[in-house]
Amino acid sequence: GLEVLGKILSGIL
């Protein structure tokens, strides 16, 4: 869900 997207974004940033 959105949690996964948040984790991915955190990895990119």
From Swiss-Prot:
GO cellular component, one term: extracellular region
Known tissue expression: Expressed by the skin glands.
Chief site of localization: secreted
Coiled-coil ranges (or none): none
Gene Ontology biological-process entries: defense response to bacterium
Annotated keywords: Amidation, Amphibian defense peptide, Antibiotic, Antimicrobial, Secreted
Signal peptide residues on this chain, from the entry's feature table: none
Keyword RNA-binding: no
Protein name per its UniProtKB record: Temporin-AVa
Species of provenance: Rana arvalis
Higher taxonomy: Eukaryota, Metazoa, Chordata, Craniata, Vertebrata
